[in-house]
Amino acid sequence: MTKKRRNNGRAKKGRGHVQPIRCTNCARCVPKDKAIKKFVIRNIVEAAAVRDISEAGVFDAYVLPKLYVKLHYCVSCAIHSKVVRNRSREARKDRTPPPRFRPAGAAPRPPPKPM
């Protein structure tokens, strides 16, 4: 039988069984190691209302809270919502993560401080 991927589309290796999780989009049961995971950090307040709220606020130093969500997708939902895309046979072997998306107006982050 031909084999499409070295890891069979999973990160299981020596474990016999992995607990299933539910897809965020369609609620399909997917093994936790096979699910495509996406960690999203967003402002609770939408971009259009940030200025209004900061002007109306009493405290100048108040930082608006963020919303931290870990999304789990089944393979079909991840492809459909363009979280991942199918790649050529040679490109599948490339394990480097895709480049991080940075908005055009964002300032570059300072390098981490040495310890």
Curated annotation (Swiss-Prot):
Q: Does the keyword Ribonucleoprotein apply?
A: yes
Q: Per the record's keyword annotation, is Transmembrane included, yes or no?
A: no
Q: Name one GO cellular component term.
A: cytoplasmic side of rough endoplasmic reticulum membrane
Task: Give one GO biological process term.
Answer: cytoplasmic translation
Chain segments carrying region Disordered: 85-115
Kindly give the PROSITE patterns that the UniProt entry links to this protein: RIBOSOMAL_S26E
Q: Where are the transmembrane segments?
A: none
Which residues lie in coiled coils? none
Any idea which residues bear Phosphoserine here? S54
Chief location: cytoplasm
Question: What does the subunit comment say?
Answer: Component of the 40S small ribosomal subunit.
The family assignment reads: Belongs to the eukaryotic ribosomal protein eS26 family.
Its function, per the record, reads: Component of the small ribosomal subunit. The ribosome is a large ribonucleoprotein complex responsible for the synthesis of proteins in the cell.
What is the name listed in the Swiss-Prot or TrEMBL entry for this protein? Small ribosomal subunit protein eS26
Q: Which organism is it from?
A: Ovis aries (Sheep)
User: Lineage in the entry?
Assistant: Eukaryota, Metazoa, Chordata, Craniata, Vertebrata
